[in-house]
């Protein structure tokens, strides 16, 4: 997918917000429920900055699993409190069969001048003939490089086109010359390391996320990644957001979601480069993150929800969103010359990632419902067993593939890119 076609709340608080609705007048704020921009500082930026000038809105956030449960409960009870929902493509897909989404072709028609790529609008149909969500914002995962690391690049290596072997060699050179392991990954409890394994590492070696989980190529991949991990800062197992170790100088080369490195780039833009993740034998895989806006079936304020979609997709709002929270426009919005250097770096990094000649697209998992956490755990458990505990690669892959098969059979989720389309549950060979 080319650049042109791409790109918690606490349950008690959420419950209180909803239970109060019965006694509030029709003039109350509409409820905008989102799985995105959940951290406290990001949610506050949405309320104070991004929603400025929009219809009066209560912005409520929740984790993906409770979000799905909440939406299902409202449908089953036929008692609707939520007007607008914001979530990832793969989180919106399961809402379709439960009848939780209202078709919004009328809203799509009013957005034709926004320049949202046709490919993204097609994704928003969720495989139907009707528009079910409007693309909201996009992001991906990148590598951030402190320029202090550049003198230690392996001979002949291009920082914008690295391989995993070169990354390991680079890390080894930095370790030998500085006495510290300078590579870093967010393997902490709230880190997004599972997305690295799913979206970057696995498809780069196997052209698959599920089907080839225990393949010979996967075995090679894990052995190669052991060499990368050997040069990674041991504190990586406690890192959640890589911007902190980057700013502290503990790590010079880090992988993470663009929103989780933004502060480091904003603080010292002249110190860093943002580059595409490394490539493996099957290409340079990356995971685009597409968030969408959908109107809930039975929305108490459908008109207000449509107006809020119009506000959030205005070019100026999209640029504010990029500047404030590091998610990039889906509309045709030219990045201004006065854009902060840190955000400009991120924009360049996203472009390098999406337009690499060997780019491979790996979509976020789709159709897993409340099994998404278990799916992620398969990858992290495999990493812990093979890399951290040094268990045999082949035996571990065989055992973990059984766990993966159980999850896919339970969810009946068909394959998604880069795996080939399947009839029924995505198979694990």
Where are these regions (language model features)?
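Short, solvent-exposed loop/beta-turn-alpha elements that line the ligand-binding surface or hinge
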Residues: 106-116, 159-160, 202-221, 266-267, ...
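Glycine-centered hinge/linker elements that transmit conformational signals in sensory
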Residues: 169-174, 208-239, 277
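Extracytoplasmic "Venus flytrap"
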Residues: 29-47, 370-371
């Amino acid at each position: 997918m080319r650049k042109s076609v791409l790109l918690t709340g606490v349950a008690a608080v959420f419950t209180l917000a909803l239970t109060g609705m019965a006694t509030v007048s029709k003039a109350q704020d509409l409820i905008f429920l989102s799985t995105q921009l959940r951290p406290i500082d990001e949610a506050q930026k949405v309320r104070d900055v991004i929603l400025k000038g929009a219809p009066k809105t209560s912005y409520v956030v929740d984790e993906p699993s409770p979000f799905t449960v909440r939406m299902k409960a409202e449908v089953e009870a036929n008692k609707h409190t939520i007007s607008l929902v914001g979530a990832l493509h793969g989180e919106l897909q399961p809402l379709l069969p439960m009848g939780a989404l209202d078709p919004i072709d009328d809203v799509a028609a009013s957005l034709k001048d926004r320049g949202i790529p046709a490919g993204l609008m097609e994704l928003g149909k969720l495989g139907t003939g009707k528009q079910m969500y409007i693309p909201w914002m996009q992001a991906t995962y990148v590598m951030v490089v402190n320029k202090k690391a550049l003198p230690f690049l392996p001979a002949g290596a291009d920082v914008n086109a690295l391989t995993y072997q070169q990354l390991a060699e680079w890390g080894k050179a930095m370790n030998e010359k500085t006495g510290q392991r300078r590579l870093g990954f967010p393997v902490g409890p709230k880190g997004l390391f599972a997305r690295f394994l799913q979206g970057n590492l696995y498809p780069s070696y196997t052209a698959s996320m599920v089907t080839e989980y225990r393949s010979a190529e996967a075995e090679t991949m894990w052995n190669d990644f052991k060499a990368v991990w050997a040069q990674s800062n041991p504190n990586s197992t406690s890192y959640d957001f890589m911007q902190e170790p980057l700013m502290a100088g503990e790590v010079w080369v880090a992988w993470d979601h663009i929103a989780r490195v933004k502060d480091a780039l904003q603080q010292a833009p002249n110190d860093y480069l943002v580059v595409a993740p490394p490539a493996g034998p099957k290409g340079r895989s990356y995971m685009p993150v597409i968030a969408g806006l959908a109107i809930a079936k039975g929305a108490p304020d459908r008109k207000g929800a449509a107006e809020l979609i119009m506000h959030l997709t205005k070019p100026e709002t999209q640029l504010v969103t990029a500047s404030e929270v590091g998610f990039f426009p889906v509309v045709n919005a030219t990045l201004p010359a006065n854009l902060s250097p840190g955000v400009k770096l991120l924009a360049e990094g996203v472009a390098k990632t999406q337009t690499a000649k060997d780019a491979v697209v790996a979509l976020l998992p789709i159709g897993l419902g409340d099994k998404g956490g278990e799916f992620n755990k398969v990858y992290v458990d495999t990493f812990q067993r093979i890399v951290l505990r040094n268990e045999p690669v082949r035996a571990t892959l065989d055992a973990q593939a059984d766990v993966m098969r159980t999850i896919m059979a339970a969810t009946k989720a068909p394959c998604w890119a880069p795996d080939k389309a399947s009839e029924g549950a995505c198979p694990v060979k």
